Swiss-Prot record:
Protein name stated in the entry: WD repeat-containing protein JIP5
Keyword hit for Repeat: yes
Family from the record: Belongs to the WD repeat WDR55 family.
UniProt-listed InterPro entries: WD40/YVTN_repeat-like_dom_sf, WD40_repeat_dom_sf, WD_repeat_multifunction
Length: 492
């Protein structure tokens, strides 16, 4: 019985994507979500970069309408296998977006007009020779940095795509060996004008984000192995960062010149290296970056390791959470919902919501049955976004968040109380009685009337919680900017 109960703890999510972007002709290598706007930027194996703006309310409305149609339509009228969310193929030659689903295309032809799908292309460009290797926004999202297999770093305006600065990174190094290094990761400081770029030889270079000049290099951090991930440790200092490579985690200060790892024979080294994990460390993030007391790392053998910097200064993991045996955890991002959770992207095509406090998976969503999940991110309203070589999915906000917001604002003056399930059952049965028998056009009109009211209430509810989190984030950022240089050291 105990074993059966354990299985039911993992919930297969009922949440669906509001948008799916597909690339049927070129592999997707990287995708970024703007921190403050509904903008997604995608880099491809062909060197192209495309920027799209989407309307979350319109996309959610379309999804809800399809759900209600599926509920109200019975018998022969039911459409099996019809995808309820918008699916668009990206044409890299023209930048156009084309509906993938035949049912949606047929509906547009019948109406005789192109429906506003809630997504538009802002710009597209052939940015790099070869593939796009890494991308990142600056702290405000005004500019985007990208590096390709051509070893050229470019800084461009986010809204227009126009390049404002570029540099051939090979020209910054004297050694012929270093000139041929390929780059794997980009990470921008949120408080200072510099970015970090990691390469396949385990080096991290500090680049001035204004003029793209080389400021410093931290070499051979992971004993010559590739940099898998880089992220900020600003709880300790604005200049402290963590990198992951091969089977170790490293912690360093970007200002240190000629820093060496603190290994046997060099115990005074300024780069703190963890114990050998005997498994590749692929990705990592803090559960709550503002508190930074718990760090989770995705591993090559399907587990997530838990690290506590305040306990042992990141010398070794404290515990582990099993996710999926014989698979790899390739990407990870915090939910930023004050729920002690992170999202993990797995090589089996699933994304897992992992509760670090409980030490277990609490939710599973399927991104792709055939392709691995190579990146996860959050959009400006904290929707999770998953991506692989073939497609990108922007998922709807969790129903838990919507219910939580609704419960806070609800009145307790009702003479009789009903459960949410009872109310939803009553509503759905009413809809079925009213809508069955109508033509498809009449059915859509009736549903649109209801959805307009529902989405206005939902939008107001969601905006309040999002605005609150953004205000807290902005206040913390302002605090960081005005604090003294030795701020937040745990020992002081």
């Amino acid at each position: 019985m105990a074993k059966s109960k354990k299985k039911t703890d993992v919930v297969d999510s009922t949440n669906l994507p509001i948008l799916e972007l597909l690339s049927l002709k070129a592999p997707i290598f990287q995708s970024l979500l703007h921190p403050e706007l509904p903008i997604i930027i995608t880099g491809f194996g062909t060197g192209h970069i495309v920027c799209h703006r989407y309307d979350p309310a319109k996309l959610q409305s379309h999804l809800d309408r399809r759900r209600r149609i599926d509920t109200a339509t019975t018998g022969k009228d039911a459409k099996k296998g019809v995808c309820p969310w918008i699916r668009l193929d990206i044409d890299l030659e023209t930048g156009d977006l084309k509906l993938v689903d035949i049912e949606e295309q047929h509906q547009q032809k019948q109406t005789g007009k192109d429906e506003d799908l809630g997504v538009k292309t802002l710009w597209k460009t052939k940015r790099h020779k070869g593939s796009v290797r890494a991308m990142c926004f600056d702290s405000k999202g005004d500019n985007i940095f990208s590096v390709g297999s051509d070893n050229v770093l470019k800084k461009a305006n986010t809204m227009t795509g126009k390049v404002v600065k570029k540099v051939n990174l090979s020209s910054l190094f004297n050694s012929e060996e270093k000139k041929n290094d390929k780059f794997t990761k980009l990470c921008a400081s949120q408080t200072h004008p510099f970015i970090l770029i990691g390469d396949e030889s385990g080096n991290i270079h500090v680049i001035n984000s204004e003029n793209l000049a080389l400021s410093n290099s931290i070499r051979s951090i992971h004993f010559g192995d590739s940099i898998n991930d880089i992220f900020h440790f600003d709880k300790r200092s604005a200049y402290k960062f963590i990198s992951l490579g091969q089977t170790t985690l490293a912690y360093f200060d970007v200002r240190d010149k000629d820093a060496k790892p603190n290994v046997a024979g060099n115990e005074d080294g300024k780069i703190l290296i963890s114990d050998d994990q005997e498994d590749e460390v692929l990705c990592g993030c803090f559960v709550d970056p503002e508190v930074a007391d718990t760090l989770l790392c995705g591993m090559g053998e399907g587990i997530v390791t838990v690290w506590k910097p305040n306990k042992n200064d990141l010398e070794d993991q404290m515990s582990r959470i099993k996710i999926s045996k014989d698979e790899s955890i390739d990407c990870i991002v915090p939910t930023l919902q004050d729920d002690n959770c992170v999202w993990c992207g797995c090589s089996n095509g699933n994304i897992y919501k992992v509760n670090a406090k409980l030490g277990k998976v609490v939710e599973v969503r399927n991104h792709n049955e055939l392709d691995e999940v190579s990146f996860v991110d959050l959009d400006f309203e904290y929707r999770v976004v998953s991506g692989g070589l073939e497609n990108i999915k922007i998922w709807e906000l969790s129903s838990d968040d919507v219910e939580e917001n609704a419960s806070v604002e609800s009145d307790s003056d009702e003479p009789l109380s009903h459960s949410d399930e009872d109310l939803s059952d009553d509503t759905s049965s009413d809809d079925e009685t009213t809508l069955v028998g109508l033509s498809k056009e009449e059915l859509l009109d009736e549903l649109d009337k209801d959805l307009k009211e529902d989405h206005q209430e939902e939008k107001e509810s969601n905006s309040k919680s999002v605005k609150k989190r953004k205000i807290m984030k902005e206040n913390n950022k302002k605090k960081d900017l005005y604090e003294h240089g030795i701020k937040k050291f745990d020992d002081l």
